Amino acid sequence: MAGQEDPVQREIHQDWANREYIEIITSSIKKIADFLNSFDMSCRSRLATLNEKLTALERRIEYIEARVTKGETLT
């Protein structure tokens, strides 16, 4: 009887080891996904801020170019 339980016990232990391994991999994938989502949001926010600053600079340049073209003083 003990000889029949040994392979079963080994299978049970192997199954638990596999489940633990899968849990570790799943947890790691979730952490990576969370990091990537956070990184994406951070990059989008920074790019939006940069875009606003560039747009404001472009408007100022266009305004200054228009004044220079008309011969107005910039003071």
From Swiss-Prot:
Q: Which UniProt keywords apply?
A: Acetylation, Coiled coil, Cytoplasm, Cytoskeleton
Kindly list any coiled-coil regions of this protein: 41-72
From the UniProt record, give one GO term of the biological process aspect. positive regulation of lamellipodium assembly
Q: Any keyword Magnesium?
A: no
Q: Which GO terms describe its molecular function?
A: identical protein binding; protein-containing complex binding
Q: Which cysteines are joined by disulfide bonds?
A: none
Where found, per UniProt?
A: Cytoplasm, Cytoskeleton
Primary subcellular site in the record, as a coarse category: cytoplasm
The family line of this record is: Belongs to the BRK1 family.
- Stored PANTHER family: PROTEIN BRICK1
Q: What is this protein called?
A: Protein BRICK1
Q: Which organism is it from?
A: Homo sapiens (Human)
